[in-house]
Curated annotation (Swiss-Prot):
Its cofactor is Mg(2+). It catalyses: 5-methylsulfanyl-2,3-dioxopentyl phosphate + H2O = 1,2-dihydroxy-5-(methylsulfanyl)pent-1-en-3-one + phosphate. It comes from Shewanella denitrificans (strain OS217 / ATCC BAA-1090 / DSM 15013). InterPro entries: Enolase-ppase_E1, HAD-like_sf, HAD-SF_hydro_IA, HAD_sf. This is Enolase-phosphatase E1. One of its GO terms (biological process) is L-methionine salvage from methylthioadenosine. Keywords: Amino-acid biosynthesis, Hydrolase, Magnesium, Metal-binding, Methionine biosynthesis. The keyword Metal-binding applies.
């Protein structure tokens, strides 16, 4: 059964993990307090602030305290919806001001065109919000790549380590799971996708190939459909 859709992880797969860890995360940590102070009246920001209070079990937390909690979560790389939403809003400002540009691996840029020419649809799946993914790909160093994608998925599909997230994705796409290939640098995510019936491929960039039950490549150049 031929592959009709490829779902790609972002950090470590299409995007240098160092860009996420050394540029995007520190930027959101640095400006979080001022961003909340300036935008706390916006409906979405206010909703995220209240969600942080609920998750942290601090219903009376000040906005400054909420910022501190979020900064701790950034340091801990917590996969929590209000944090990811706020990071997306903050990164939007950073991209717009040209504080940074999205760093996408050249082999993926080449491959995405090749796959589309073969009639294969491309989607991304990240713990970062859909908004953050669109920002990453629309403000890349080579320009706007979003027209090359057929869609994006985030934590609203479920936790990336849970089988249900991948069941939700293939139900959304309306394709048999065996026609969907999930590519990630994290074996636990691939195992969850495999349990949902998807085809899988481990992206091992710059490392010796690891023992795995999944197909394994060192770049998208080697991933032929």
């Amino acid at each position: 059964m031929s592959i009709k859709a490829i779902v790609v992880d972002t950090a470590g797969t299409t995007t240098d993990l160092n860009f996420i860890q050394d540029v995007l995360f520190p930027y959101s940590h640095q400006v979080m307090a001022s961003f909340l102070a300036q935008n706390q009246q916006q409906v979405l920001v206010e909703s995220c602030i209240n969600d942080v209070r609920d998750i942290a079990l601090e219903p009376s937390a000040t906005v400054a305290r909420v910022a501190e909690i979020l900064q701790i979560w950034i340091t801990e790389d917590r996969k929590l919806a209000p944090l990811k939403t706020l990071q997306g809003l903050i990164w939007k400002q950073g991209y717009s001001s040209l504080a940074f540009q999205g760093q996408i691996y050249p082999d993926f840029i080449e491959a995405i065109s090749r796959y589309r020419q073969q009639g294969v649809a491309i989607y991304s799946f990240s713990s970062g919000s859909v908004e953050a993914q669109k920002l990453l790909f629309s403000h890349s160093e080579v320009g706007d790549l979003t027209p090359m994608f057929s869609g994006h998925f985030d934590m609203r599909m479920g936790n990336k380590l849970d089988k249900q997230a991948y069941l939700n994705i293939h139900n959304t796409l309306g394709l048999p799971p065996k026609q969907i290939l999930f590519v990630s640098d994290t074996q636990e995510e691939l195992t969850a996708a495999q349990a949902a019936g998807m085809m899988t491929c481990l992206m091992s960039r710059g490392d010796a190939f690891a023992p795995t039950e999944h197909k394994q490549v060192g770049s998208f150049t080697a991933l032929n459909i």
